[in-house]
Each structure stands twice: as structure tokens, then as C-alpha cells.
Regions:
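Metal-dependent catalytic neighborhoods of phosphoester/phosphodiester hydrolases
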Residues: 5-25, 53-57
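CN hydrolase (nitrilase-like) catalytic-core segments centered on the catalytic cysteine
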Residues: 25-45, 113-176
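Short, acidic, Ser/Thr-enriched surface-loop or helix-capping motifs
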Residues: 65-66
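Short clusters of small/polar residues that mark proteolytic maturation junctions
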Residues: 75, 112-113
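A short, polar/charged loop-to-alpha-helix boundary motif
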Residues: 76-90
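Beta-strand-turn-beta hairpins that frame and shape the catalytic cleft
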Residues: 100-109, 131-132
Length: 176
């Protein structure tokens, strides 16, 4: 799933009402997704808005194995604060470190969106044993920018994904 898939990407504005979208991880979404993972024998990587406690929120990805078992979570470490991406208003940087999850099909590493611009994140995760890197992402065309600038940013995004694969000898999956 793409980044924060249970709603539209809400970080394009600073709105306290959006904190109502947060949930515990594991929690209701992971319970439902565990049933689906087991039913379809697939690994599910789900990006969620995590409420850790009152006033402490994370951009978190949960990993559920093909047997429905919750394997754990990764919390986004690099939090942007750019026009249209006001994530520092919502999220605290992750505190779980870079992790590798041993699934039925492969050892996978999870990094989230803005983490992609920091090559050490991909490197550390692959050195820890990841065979595939997954990047749940929410990057789009900025309506206030001209087409040429949007295209340049899109090309940079494509290039950074490819470079992680080549430099680290792994597959990279970016879900946007």
C-alpha cells in the first residue's frame, strides 16, 4: 500500500482534526489486514498513522506475514517539512532503527517516502540482510508548480530508487 493508505494524504495542510485518523499499531487495521494476508497467502506492508500515546504520533509501516502473523513495524525516521508536506506537524521521527523482517518469501526492509533521499538508510538496511527494499510513498505532482519542475522532481525520484537498487544489489519496490 502507498504511504498512509487508510485516508487521502492529509499532510498537505496543518489541521488538528487529522489526528483523529491515527490508530494504534498493531490495532484495528493490522487485525483486518492479518486476516487478508492469511486468506490470500501474501505479505502485507501497510503504512499507517500511528498514535503511540496522546501527543506522540508516527508515520509507521506494519509488516504482516503470509500466515497472518504481525511481524513488527518501522517508524519513518526522516520527516519532511516542505510546502505541501507538513509532516513535522504530525509525526515524531522514528525510534526503532532500520529493520529487516524475515517473511515467508524474502527478507525485506521497509523505509518510508522521505527516507529515500538518505542513502545510508538503504545501505544500513541491506547490510542488515534485506533482499528487497519497500518504500511506501506519497509523492505527487505539485499543482502550484510548472510541469517542467514537476517532471524534474519525478525524474530525480525515479533515479534515487534505481540507485538504491544498483548500489545495494537489491530489488526496490516503491508504492506511490
Amino acid at each position: 500500500f502507498q504511504e498512509l493508505f487508510t485516508s487521502l494524504y492529509f499532510c498537505d495542510e496543518e489541521n488538528y482534526e487529522n489526528f483523529k485518523l491515527a490508530e494504534s499499531v498493531p490495532g484495528p487495521s493490522t487485525e483486518l489486514l492479518a486476516v487478508l494476508a492469511k486468506e490470500h497467502n501474501v505479505v502485507i506492508i501497510a503504512s499507517l498513522f500511528e498514535k503511540r500515546t496522546e501527543g506522540l504520533y508516527h508515520n509507521t509501516t506494519a509488516v504482516i506475514d503470509a500466515d497472518g502473523k504481525y511481524l513488527g513495524k518501522y517508524r519513518k525516521m526522516h520527516i519532511p517539512d516542505d510546502p505541501g508536506y507538513y509532516e513535522k506537524f504530525y509525526f515524531t521521527p522514528g525510534d526503532l532503527g532500520y529493520k529487516v523482517f524475515k517473511t515467508k518469501y524474502a527478507n525485506i526492509g521497509i523505509l518510508i517516502c522521505w527516507d529515500q533521499w538518505y542513502p545510508e538508510a538503504a545501505r544500513i538496511t541491506t547490510l542488515a540482510g534485506a533482499e528487497i527494499l519497500f518504500y511506501p510513498t506519497a509523492i505527487g505532482w505539485a499543482t502550484g508548480q510548472d510541469a517542467a519542475t514537476n517532471d524534474e522532481q519525478y525524474q530525480a525520484w525515479q533515479t534515487i530508487q534505481r540507485s538504491h537498487a544498483v548500489a545495494n544489489g537489491v530489488y526496490v519496490v516503491s508504492v506511490n
